[in-house]
């Protein structure tokens, strides 16, 4: 029985080689639209789909392959006598290969196009053919990914057929693709309508397999959103090896912290926790301030700066071992210096972080919430003493940092530098003591949540703290206010909590 292949592709890379391979094996090629024209121009013998259906393309190409003569040829089960009898009676030929890739909706939805223009890139005929072929994978070879062309050709060369195992895998890839494609369309159409829809569909594409996850015994891979360009799916590696699982997680937080500030800022980070954060006039100044805040923890850590890195900064950075250095850009002479460290990963972050929903898996489900991107609308002074202008600036700085520290979280600040960070403690007094121990000489203390008792204020006073900022909201707020008044400390309530679990 003569074999037939239906080829209809938007991305034509590799399709000429595949079509020629099939024609050399006497497989009849059927195509439509631009693919038909492309194959014809490249001397591939091909039939136009309208010759099969006796029906022209219509509605500006919206209807080309949506026809019973096409889909019956794909869906007919070859060892089902009734199916084959129906095909014979209707003079319908079987289709044995379906080679289709889709309109680039993933790419176009991210471009600056009108709503109507984006809608035109929603493919209908392609998914219909792919789904039909994938359902009937026992009899039809379905190719939705150009990376699989060679696998199919190799099996045909070796065995004169495509194995059941590969057919099944290719069919699975179709439905995997279609779920992502449909998710992207769904999210596009529901954007701004339902913040938390009835069914959660997310669309991510694998960028790379990672060597391992958090630990060597854990497998891992990195997936990129198909729907928007965030900071972590658009960076460029300018030096060093590929990023690890831990590198990517840490870089994400370090870059978010640095981008919290309009002024030049640096975040040094280790194990997903900031260990030194500073603002200042230039990249060298903020790096050295962040380094001095905790010269021990920064070793082997990640550093992100929200400004171009110059040679002077790079020369300071290479004095110690760092895993990753990230910035929006680098001077050429700075890159030369950084590249003297062969294993130092130098990352150009092209985008600022996008405020999207945050998801975390639990056993049997996913929790979804909005990003914690809100700061206080007003700062309410609740004590007799008011903070100075510099103390208020440090308070706001501290609240920008503390929301990235695991709760219970305390940050001690002095002159635009987080001098002490205490986090991940099961009670607030321990976090306070940890931050104060590291941040001796700090003037301002920021807390991610209210003080349940006055003990944190008393501890702060013993260590020279002059001003405190916290959300407020405890039933014992008055005790903390009274303690501040006793110690001559100013305190501000924000009304905005920043728990991080």
From Swiss-Prot:
Pfam families the UniProt entry points to: AICARFT_IMPCHas, MGS
Catalyses which reaction(s): (6R)-10-formyltetrahydrofolate + 5-amino-1-(5-phospho-beta-D-ribosyl)imidazole-4-carboxamide = 5-formamido-1-(5-phospho-D-ribosyl)imidazole-4-carboxamide + (6S)-5,6,7,8-tetrahydrofolate; IMP + H2O = 5-formamido-1-(5-phospho-D-ribosyl)imidazole-4-carboxamide
Transmembrane segments: none
GO molecular function: IMP cyclohydrolase activity; phosphoribosylaminoimidazolecarboxamide formyltransferase activity
Pathway: Purine metabolism; IMP biosynthesis via de novo pathway; 5-formamido-1-(5-phospho-D-ribosyl)imidazole-4-carboxamide from 5-amino-1-(5-phospho-D-ribosyl)imidazole-4-carboxamide (10-formyl THF route): step 1/1; Purine metabolism; IMP biosynthesis via de novo pathway; IMP from 5-formamido-1-(5-phospho-D-ribosyl)imidazole-4-carboxamide: step 1/1
UniProt domain MGS-like: residue ranges: 1-144
The EC number(s) this enzyme carries: 2.1.2.3, 3.5.4.10
GO biological process: 'de novo' IMP biosynthetic process
Protein family per UniProt: Belongs to the PurH family.
Entry-linked PANTHER family: BIFUNCTIONAL PURINE BIOSYNTHESIS PROTEIN ATIC (PTHR11692:SF0), BIFUNCTIONAL PURINE BIOSYNTHESIS PROTEIN PURH (PTHR11692)
Protein name, UniProt field: Bifunctional purine biosynthesis protein PurH
Gene behind this protein: purH
